Amino acid sequence: MTHGRYERRGPRPVRRLWVVLLAAGLLAAGCAGGGAGAQEEDAQAEREAPAGDVSPVAEVARRIEPSVVQVNVSSIQTSPYGPQEAQGLGSGVVYREDGYVITNNHVVEGADTVNVAFADGSVEKGEVVGGDPYTDIAVVKVDRVNLPAAEFADSGDLVVGQLAVAAGSPSGFQSTVTSGIISGLNREIPPEITGGSQQSALVDLIQTDAAISPGSSGGALVDRTGSVIGINVAYLPPAQTGAVNLGFAIPSATATDVADAIIEDGRAEHPYVGVSLIDLTPEIARRFDVSVESGAIVTGVDPDGPASDAGIEPGGVVTAVEGEKITSTGDLLAALRRHDPGDSVELTVAREGEAREFTVELEGKG
C-alpha cells in the first residue's frame, strides 16, 4: 500500500463531493442511528445528571473544556507574487500533563510554526514531535508542565446509540461543544478526504451525529463521563449528502497507541504486507470472470515485500485474514492494524476458482 505527501496551500475545493477538510480553512494571506438504544442512553444520562438545571452535556463540557486546545499553524508558501504566509487552525487534546498534545496529522503537516491556545487564554509555542499519515494522528509538544490532561476511555467498549459530545474550535470559536450519539462504528472513509498525505483509507472510525465543523479537526469526541473516546477527523457536509451531521472520529485506542509510539520513537510503525489493492465490486468480478464477488484484488506485489516472500501474486483476491471475512481494502487494513510488525498472519486468497492460504510475516513501515 503506497503513501504520498500533501502540501498545504489555500482553501481546498471539495473533491468528488467528498468530505470537507476539518483542519479548517486556511486563512491565507490572502449515519444511521440510535432508535430505542439512543433513547435509553439519553434517559440514563438524564438520571445521572447533576441536581438543578444543568444538563449532562453541560457537565461533560465542563469536564473536557480545560483539556481541549486550539492549534494555530502557519507556513511560508511560494506564489507568483513571492513568498506568502498561509495560516490555518485546528484543535487538539492534552494527552499528558508534561506538555504532549494529540491532534490530526493534516492539521500540522507542513507547518513552519505551531502555537497552542489553551482554554485559560494562554498560548504556548508548539513543536511537532511527529505525525502519522496512515492514521492521521500527530503529536505536538509545548514547553509547559502540569497541563490538564484529558482522560481517555477504551473505545473498544463503545455501542451505537450512546451519548457523544464533540469539543473543538470550529472556525476559530474556541471551547465549542456539540452533542449527539454514536451513529456507527468501524466506518471507513477514502484517503483523499482529509487533504493529508495518506493514500490508504482511514478505517475503524467512529461515526457520530454530533456536529463537527471546519476547525474541529483534532478535537475530542467524549462520552458521558467526559472521557475521550475519539479524535475528530472529518465530516460529510449536509449540502452534498442530504444527510445531517455525519462526522467521524479516530478511536481513542488507535490515537493513544500511535501517540505513544510517536512520543517514544518519533514515528509509528504499521504492519506492511507489500501489496497494492483495489476493492472487488460485482462489476469488476463479472468483467474479469472472478469467482468471488467481494474482497480486495491484489493489483501489484512488492518484489521485496512479505507478500511476495509468501508466494502471493497479482490477480488474486484477498477474502479473509485469520479466517475473518474481507469485503474491501478497508476491511483488510483494519484487520492488519490489529497486528504488529513481526506477527505472522494467514491470508486467504482466491485465484482461478481456488482459495489458498498464505502465511505472511508482517514487516514494519511508518
At which residue positions do the language-model features occur?
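Serine-dependent protease modules
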Residues: 32-286, 292-293, 303, 333, ...
